[in-house]
Amino acid sequence: MKPSENPLGSEPISTLLRRFAVPSVIAMLVSALYNMVDQLFIGHSIGVLGNAATNVAFPLSMVCTSIGLLCGIGGAANFNLCMGRKDPEHAKSYVGNAISMLAILGVILCVAVQLFLRPMMLLFGATPDVIDYACTYTRITSIGFPFLIVTIGGSNLIRADGSLKFSMLCNLVGAIVNTILD
């Protein structure tokens, strides 16, 4: 394999599965770990109402993940199809379009959450004791939704290019920054 060649087109599937599985599993473990760290910090500093507030807001994290995966995996699949056809120009346009969609949808979600925050929190099950905590937490964290969405989608696009370790490194840096900012 040439150094600049994408391994997805030239290496055996068994080798690719091993090479892709380890960084992906590490990234998932890191993600789970920093969610646990968040809960520990919030529980110790605010208490059970703080933990309840983050749980009420959690569906919005899943929306971010869903949007990121939708655009990231879709863009990555089309990127790989184009690369398989030896059409790098169209492959680049799919990546560019995916990144644009990630950013645009991230901003739209952030604005929608800011505009409809209280009704959303009530819809997600916030009680009178928790609603103010949930709104405060979500108003702050929603500012980061565009970045989260671009990161999730971008890591799929990076992996499609065969840059597994770089994708994993980006996830690790995100987890470390998240922990420090807590």
What are these language model-derived features?
Residues 1-24, 79-146:
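Short alpha-helical transmembrane segments in multi-pass integral membrane proteins
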Residues 10, 14-33, 37, 60-67, ...:
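Residue-level signal for short hydrophobic patches within transmembrane helices
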Residues 24, 28, 40, 44, ...:
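Transmembrane alpha-helix boundary and packing residues in multipass membrane permease domains
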Residues 36-39, 111, 119, 153-157, ...:
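Alpha-helical transmembrane segments of multipass membrane proteins
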Residues 42-62, 129-133:
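Interfacial/gating helices of multi-pass transporter permease domains
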Residues 113, 152, 166-182:
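Alpha-helical transmembrane segments of multi-pass membrane transporters
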